[in-house]
């Protein structure tokens, strides 16, 4: 109901305005017969105003507004939607002309009128008659005694509602009309946002938003709908295992109407109707969602846990990564975290994981993490082809099965070097957004494939500020509530990567009241040992216990056991290897230690070649102040560890690649720690040239 536009809600229309004959247009009282005036007019006359025109000097002639019949208000016909005035809620046209009513999907028995004629669809036939659907929730029966001809499932029929029985059953009879008007009967429900639905349990509501996930179950079809305040799951049932609303896929803008219920403590809408929107209305909803996402995605303002010029210089880049991750969460875009399979990479990834999982559950429900999040380790110190192929296959499968967006790829402790290029070129083809948080020496060529790239080398820092340190602070930007549970992770990362940066000492001191340095060292070793056996699995439960996210006694027990096993394996390996280490003094005074890991080390067990070379290097550095380089090699690889030598391993790899034709040299890593690969037949040439290059470097 609203004001009549024809009369501006007055109920009358002015048709003429003329001069008052009593006062000649002056508005002043003249000589008049007081006995002929009413009390009000008498008061006006005594006050000097003309009682005929009320002092205006003119007489206004009006007539009743025909549009609203003098009511000043108009109604909307419940059947045809046209404006009318008067009593009731149906216009005169609809009451006089024969009409057949077509109920919308939202209509129920409360919208029925006994004696009215409706259009329906035959849903099923039985011996005693035919069932007819008048809407999604309204069904009646035509008894066989009232059927003069055969009807089949799917036939459109016109039926008169003869009676609504006490048990709610509808008694229908078929009718035939030569002239009639189809009148669509719509029903609207109040629109809410997803964040308001908890108070609407048991009610029928409408929401508008964007479909971000479609999942077909053995029963209903589950649509996940995103609006400006969050997401809600909507269950639509056609038949068991049959896709409901097949015309609606992910990214569609829709309105959904249905009953609000709780399922496993999560809000769910039991869909009564779902309509796809296009044009201006869809654009408005889309823009509203985007604006809300942009505001919600802003990361939290935090103070870093330790003082660091490098971290301070990286803050803007870290905020950009945090915002991109938060946006993925709140828009229900899947997130894939890739990390190097060592203590630094694992703590970096787990810090982010602990920050985002509560938000993912909050946005998408208790099982959302299984649809919108995955973490995978990378064995190589770069994002290699086996990683990207697996990630793309998983992403495309999820897109085909559930209509999901392609994921946001978050790479930590990897992703900065030329070796990552082949994989990044594939992400570009598929339109997968990539952000990198790393501390390996970066190659600028990768940045063209990345949305964001945070690396201490970009601001004058170096590998001493590890990925675990950066991601610990990044996680707090994403979700500050996880600070207390993850603040020991940067210290574990520092010890695992043997960082000597001042930030390492600061993070270790930060948690000294809870963890001894030896405790943190043990956690780092346990992570390295577990990572070796986990291979491509994320091992979330085991890793959480190692990092003390579960029961304290279990944490202590598993760390102690894994460290005993790891140290035993390392000692066995060194007992075998140390007698076979060959040492020579290079021209620059460097002590070069070389071991053939192919022939003089246990293979396919812990510690792997890189860890073995590192342990040998540490032992050889004890009690030795000279510059030391340890080179562990196999048929087609070499692992380099160094101390006191100004090395740049990525640059050395490029030089070897250019100088030794046919050697197929590639590799990289940090400036002073890395690995090189080459073809087996050129091993002697590569190692000889490598030794020459090391002997010509500056030492300190």
Write out the residue ranges for each language-model feature.
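Short nucleic-acid-contacting surface segments enriched for D/E, G, S/T with interspersed K/R
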Residues: 147-158, 240-257
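N-terminal small/polar loop signature for handling phosphorylated ligands or for N-terminal nucleophile
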Residues: 235-237, 344, 358-435, 442-445
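Structural detector for short beta-strands of small beta-barrel domains
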Residues: 112-126, 157-161, 201-218, 258
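OB-fold (S1/OB) nucleic-acid-binding surfaces
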Residues: 126-128, 133-142, 213-240
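Short boundary/loop segments of OB/S1/cold-shock single-stranded nucleic-acid-binding domains
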Residues: 95-115, 148-150, 179-203, 244-245
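OB-fold/S1-family single-stranded nucleic acid-binding modules
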Residues: 167-189, 261-288
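Glycine-rich, acidic loop segments that terminate in or are immediately followed by a histidine
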Residues: 480, 593-700
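A structured phosphate/pyrophosphate-recognition subdomain
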Residues: 330-337, 341-342, 444-599, 616-617, ...
């Amino acid at each position: 109901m609203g004001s009549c536009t024809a009369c501006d809600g007055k109920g009358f229309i002015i048709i003429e305005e003329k001069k008052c004959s009593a006062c000649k247009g002056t508005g002043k009282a003249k000589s008049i017969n007081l006995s002929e005036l009413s009390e009000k007019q008498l008061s006006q006359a005594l006050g000097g105003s003309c009682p005929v025109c009320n002092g205006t000097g003119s007489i206004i002639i009006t007539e009743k507004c025909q549009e609203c019949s003098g009511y000043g208000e108009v109604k909307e016909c419940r059947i045809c939607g046209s404006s009318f005035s008067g009593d009731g809620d149906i216009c005169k046209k609809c009451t006089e002309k024969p009409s057949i009513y077509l109920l919308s999907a939202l209509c129920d028995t409360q919208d029925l009128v006994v004696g009215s004629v409706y259009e329906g669809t035959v849903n099923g036939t039985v011996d005693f008659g035919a069932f007819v659907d008048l809407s999604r929730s309204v069904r009646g029966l035509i008894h066989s005694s009232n059927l003069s001809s055969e009807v089949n499932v799917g036939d459109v029929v016109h039926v008169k509602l003869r009676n609504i029985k006490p048990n709610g059953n509808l008694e229908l009879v078929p009718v035939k009309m030569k002239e009639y008007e189809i009148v669509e009967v719509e029903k609207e429900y109040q629109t809410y946002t997803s964040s308001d639905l908890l108070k609407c349990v048991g009610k029928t509501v409408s929401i508008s938003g964007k479909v971000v996930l479609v999942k077909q179950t053995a029963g209903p079809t589950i649509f996940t709908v995103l609006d400006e305040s969050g997401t809600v799951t909507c269950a639509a049932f056609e038949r068991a295992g049959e896709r409901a609303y097949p015309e609606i896929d992910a990214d569609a803008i829709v309105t959904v109407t249905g009953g609000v219920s709780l399922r496993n403590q999560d809000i769910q809408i039991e869909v009564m109707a779902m309509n796809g929107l296009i044009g201006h209305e869809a654009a408005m909803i889309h823009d509203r969602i985007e604006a809300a996402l942009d505001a919600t995605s802003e990361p939290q303002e935090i103070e870093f846990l330790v003082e660091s010029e490098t971290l301070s210089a990286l803050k803007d880049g870290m905020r950009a990564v945090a915002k991109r991750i938060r946006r993925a969460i709140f828009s229900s875009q899947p997130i894939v975290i890739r990390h190097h399979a060592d203590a630094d990479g694992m703590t970096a990834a787990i810090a982010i994981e602990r920050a985002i999982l509560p938000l993912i559950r909050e946005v998408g429900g208790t099982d959302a993490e299984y649809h919108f999040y995955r973490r995978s380790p990378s064995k190589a110190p770069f994002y290699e082809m086996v990683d990207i192929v697996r990630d793309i296959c998983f992403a495309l499968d999820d897109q085909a099965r559930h209509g999901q967006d392609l994921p946001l790829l978050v790479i930590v402790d990897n992703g900065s070097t030329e070796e990552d290029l082949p994989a990044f070129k594939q992400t570009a083809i598929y339109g997968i957004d990539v952000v990198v948080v790393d501390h390996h020496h970066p190659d600028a060529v990768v940045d063209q494939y990345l949305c964001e790239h945070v690396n201490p080398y970009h601001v004058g820092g170096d590998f001493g500020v590890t990925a675990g340190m950066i991601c610990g602070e990044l996680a707090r930007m994403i979700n500050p509530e996880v600070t207390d549970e993850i603040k020991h992770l940067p210290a574990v990362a520092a010890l695992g990567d043997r960082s000597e940066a001042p930030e390492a000492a600061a993070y270790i001191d930060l948690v000294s009241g809870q963890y001894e340095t030896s405790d943190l060292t043990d956690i780092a070793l346990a992570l390295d040992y577990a990572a070796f056996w986990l291979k491509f699995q994320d091992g979330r439960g085991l890793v959480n216990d190692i990092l003390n996210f579960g029961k304290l006694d279990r944490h202590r027990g598993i760390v102690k056991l894994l460290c005993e096993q790891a140290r035993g394996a390392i000692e066995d390996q060194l007992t075998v290897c140390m007698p076979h280490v060959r040492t020579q003094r290079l021209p620059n005074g460097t002590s070069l230690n070389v071991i053939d890991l192919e022939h003089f080390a246990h293979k396919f067990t812990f510690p792997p070649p890189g860890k073995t070379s590192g342990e040998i290097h540490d032992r050889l550095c004890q009690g030795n102040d000279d510059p030391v380089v340890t080179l562990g090699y196999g048929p087609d690889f070499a692992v380099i560890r160094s101390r006191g030598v100004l090395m740049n391993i990525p640059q050395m790899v490029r030089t070897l690649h250019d100088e030794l034709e046919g050697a197929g040299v590639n590799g990289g890593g940090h400036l002073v720690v890395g690995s090189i690969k080459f073809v087996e037949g050129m091993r002697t040439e590569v190692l000889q040239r490598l030794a020459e290059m090391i002997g010509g470097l500056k030492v300190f």
